[in-house]
Amino acid sequence: MAYRKLGRTSSQRKAMFRDLTTDLLINESIVTTEARAKEIRKTVEKMITLGKRGNLHARRQAAAFVRNEIASESYDEAKDEYTSTTALQKLFSEIAPRYAERNGGYTRILKTEPRRGDAAPMAIIELV
């Protein structure tokens, strides 16, 4: 299996992929290097496919990979309480139904200008 090492050990690389995948699911668009964008595209597509499957096993598989971060928070004045949505809940309730009719190709990578400090090729990865 071919993959990019990205100058990191395997555990560091896996942690970075988990972080970037979770950030992309929460924000639906992130700016990163081109190599990282091409690598996390694989994991994001797998997570959305799990979300489309929607059964308990798929939810547990996605929960094992996606970080437990708050995607959105709202305040209900009538009940005087805050309600929050995690990245996993957003994946299964908002993102996956959006792509119910689409078979793959859930992300788009747009190349941008090189980073100022080290001229690394940058890209915007976003959900289609």
Curated annotation (Swiss-Prot):
Q: Name one GO cellular component term.
A: cytosolic large ribosomal subunit
**Domain of life from the UniProt record:** Bacteria
Q: Does the keyword Ribosomal protein apply?
A: yes
Gene Ontology molecular function: structural constituent of ribosome
Tell me which UniProt keywords the record has, alphabetically. Ribonucleoprotein, Ribosomal protein
Instruction: Give yes or no: UniProt keyword Ribosomal protein.
Output: yes
UniProt GO BP: translation
A Pfam match is Ribosomal_L17
InterPro entries, A to Z: Ribosomal_bL17, Ribosomal_bL17_CS, Ribosomal_bL17_sf
Query: Could you say which residues form the signal peptide?
Result: none
UniProt-listed NCBIfam families: L17
The UniProt entry, under HAMAP family, shows:
Ribosomal_bL17
Listed under subunit, the entry gives:
Part of the 50S ribosomal subunit. Contacts protein L32.
The UniProt entry's sequence similarity note says:
Belongs to the bacterial ribosomal protein bL17 family.
Q: What is this protein called?
A: Large ribosomal subunit protein bL17
